Amino acid sequence: MYNYLDFEKPVADLEGKILELKKLSESGEAVDVAEEISRLERRSKDALRDVYRALTPWQKAQVARHPDRPHCMDYVRALFTDFTPLAGDRAYGEDEAVVAGFARFKGQSIAIVGQEKGNDTHSRLKHNFGMARPEGYRKAVRIMDLADRFGIPVVSLVDTAGAYPGIGAEERGQAEAIARSTSKCLSLKVPNISVIIGEGGSGGAIAIATANLVYMLEHSIYSVISPEGAASILWHDSTRAKDAATNMKITAQDLLQLKVIDGIIPEPVGGAHRASDVVIRTTGETIENGFRELAEKVGDFREQRREKFLAIGRSL
């Protein structure tokens, strides 16, 4: 059974009936329900398509946060081989909210930096729900330094509600760590590609998402603050998150129109969590094509990246 979101109730009702009929059929009772199951499955597919065809920005935010959505390590395990993670920032400690290391992708060496949320209570606590501390961003800088030194392209997989706002993180220089990571992304001499696979929250996301090419999954979000946070600031009422999401231009479609991102990776009907293997494969193909495009069209990766982000600033 899926974890249904509140706006998926029509689909949940139909799929619940299908499950009941399948159990009845498997029980051995002399009842032919195959035709009814087939009819309900068609209705369910149509209902799911109708729901996802008309998602609001707030509903997309809910899909982006879905607990069953594939996370960073799901992509790493499926797309890359010989992944060797590196740990620690060589200054304070290790932050498991950030996954970083080297691997092989389509026969080539690649550096990977990503944010991992975890998929159950234990792993979510271990990875701090994907909210990185300063050590995580300094680890990312360490990996990008090595990649730059050895001429290895960088892939970043972004999925965070934002950098961790705890007192300890602030005491250890959270803002400086984010700024340094962003600066490192901008100064890389090698090509880098970033994919927003779920949430792209504030500076916590942009610290590893400042890339030559930035892609978003179809139902991911990317914003300077969460809808709840914006609603709390603007109206002193976090329950108005729906209104905030509508006005913030947080969806992939809005950001492509604003030229903040370079492309949208399609998701299966119902979201990435309904067919993880499909969306992961499509993401891999997009990354491969992106690096090929950069190799063919860009001579100076650092200059192209600089001009890209300056152009965003001029146009907004």
Curated annotation (Swiss-Prot):
Its EC number is 2.1.3.15. It is found in: Cytoplasm. Keywords: ATP-binding, Cytoplasm, Fatty acid biosynthesis, Fatty acid metabolism, Lipid biosynthesis, Lipid metabolism, Nucleotide-binding, Transferase. One of its GO terms (molecular function) is ATP binding. GO terms for cellular component: acetyl-CoA carboxylase complex. InterPro entries: Acetyl_CoA_COase_a_su, ClpP/crotonase-like_dom_sf, COA_CT_C. PROSITE patterns: COA_CT_CTER. It is an enzyme of class 2 (transferase). One of its GO terms (biological process) is malonyl-CoA biosynthetic process. It catalyses: N(6)-carboxybiotinyl-L-lysyl-[protein] + acetyl-CoA = N(6)-biotinyl-L-lysyl-[protein] + malonyl-CoA. Pathway: Lipid metabolism; malonyl-CoA biosynthesis; malonyl-CoA from acetyl-CoA: step 1/1. Residues 40-293 form the CoA carboxyltransferase C-terminal domain. Belongs to the AccA family. PANTHER family: ACETYL-COENZYME A CARBOXYLASE CARBOXYL TRANSFERASE SUBUNIT ALPHA, ACETYL-COENZYME A CARBOXYLASE CARBOXYL TRANSFERASE SUBUNIT ALPHA, CHLOROPLASTIC. Component of the acetyl coenzyme A carboxylase (ACC) complex. First, biotin carboxylase catalyzes the carboxylation of biotin on its carrier protein (BCCP) and then the CO(2) group is transferred by the carboxyltransferase to acetyl-CoA to form malonyl-CoA. Acetyl-CoA carboxylase is a heterohexamer composed of biotin carboxyl carrier protein (AccB), biotin carboxylase (AccC) and two subunits each of ACCase subunit alpha (AccA) and ACCase subunit beta (AccD). NCBIfam families: accA, AccA_sub, PRK05724.1. This is Acetyl-coenzyme A carboxylase carboxyl transferase subunit alpha. The gene is accA.
